[in-house]
Amino acid sequence: MGLPPKTIVLDNGAYHIKAGFAGGKVVEIPNCLTRSKDGNRLFLGNELANCNDFTTLQFRRAHEKGYLVHWSTETAVWDLVMRNVGVMEPSMADYSLLLTQPVFTMPSIEHNTIQLVFEEFQFDAYLPCTPAELIPWDHGSFTMNQEDAYTGQHGECVLVIDSGYSFTHIIPVIDFSVQEQAVKRVDVGGKLLTNYLKEVISYRKYNMMEETYIVNEIKESVCYVSQNFKEDMEICHEKPRSKLEICYALPDYSTGKHGYIVRDINQKIEQQVLNLSNERFMIPELLFSPSDIEIREAGIPEAVMQSVTHFPENIQAMLLENVVTIGGNCKFPGFHKRLSSELRSLAPANWEVKVFEPSDPICFPWKKASHMPLEHWNANKITRSEYSEHGANIMTRKRRI
């Protein structure tokens, strides 16, 4: 039996919130407040879809460097989220909340969060956890649809690669518990990749340093992970035109609000056009080689191997046989093939390496939350009465998932 029927699962990402009733449908809402180009309009969350001009938008996000710090912004976004999932009551007293937080969330942030949950929204019960801790639940099917069939042999040992907006974490989960001593962080996330693409385009093509929204759309449309970086760089030097080069038509806001890839290079285009070649794979390459921009850290494959070395060899082998990727950066074409290839080259030859690719790595933790057993929820939740008795210090008295 899963979570209680009035439990809202809220995967509180720094870029997008994924929310909905456990076992129901998930909604994705931008976790930000956006100011329009002229400064006269503010868009909260998914109201941004009503914007007619995405140039020079200014974003105020509730998170800084991956952690929740702007409480007034988050309160406003959560109000919108509750309406979007179908809660119309002013009080949440009849509802429970399962909320995700990043690994290593500071106690001060946890205390402010629990105050927001019980004092501002008045939830009846609350359970915080990391997205990675939700992945092993319902190990038998590992997902809600056949596309995500999971056939790993050791569900008690899962290695989660969570690569999102702010950073990438390598998180071993054993017996449904994060092994914090072995968690590794790579300071490369979607925000850094978009900012780097802005710099590259602005230096080589047009000045787009203020066009975060547009450049992010370009990144998601054209970028991919190279399987052979040196070979692809050589291809990009082909004349007169590299087979990797594409044309991207920028939005002009008269014929459309969004840019698009020009499939026919002979087509007459009225909009400004970006020609992109090695930019397409240079940007995601930072996930595997942060040192390219002088970030002195290991890439994801090396960080995985550094993480598993904290365990005995038999556990290391089980973790590498159960690697699961979540987060928006995992959607780059070629990401899983490159990751599998590099892990295979780093692991001992007699170990099996399996990297499982959810069909929707962004919403996958949210979907897995619905399979948490009711007895586990009841044993670990924090109730409003407990909060009333102990205050925010209840966080130190209760064992988290």
UniProtKB/Swiss-Prot annotation:
A GO molecular function held by the record: nucleosome binding
Reported function: Component of the SWR1 complex which mediates the ATP-dependent exchange of histone H2A for the H2A variant HZT1 leading to transcriptional regulation of selected genes by chromatin remodeling. Involved in chromosome stability.
Origin organism lineage: Eukaryota, Fungi, Dikarya, Ascomycota, Taphrinomycotina
Chief subcellular location: cytoplasm
GO biological process: chromatin remodeling; transcription initiation-coupled chromatin remodeling
Presence of the UniProt keyword Transcription regulation in the record: yes
Keyword terms of this UniProt record: Activator, Chromatin regulator, Cytoplasm, Nucleus, Transcription, Transcription regulation
Protein name: Actin-like protein arp6
Family statement: Belongs to the actin family. ARP6 subfamily.
Subcellular location: Cytoplasm; Nucleus
Family matches, as Pfam families: Actin
Cellular component annotations (GO), alphabetically ordered: cytosol; nucleus; Swr1 complex
Binding partners and assembly: Component of the SWR1 chromatin remodeling complex.
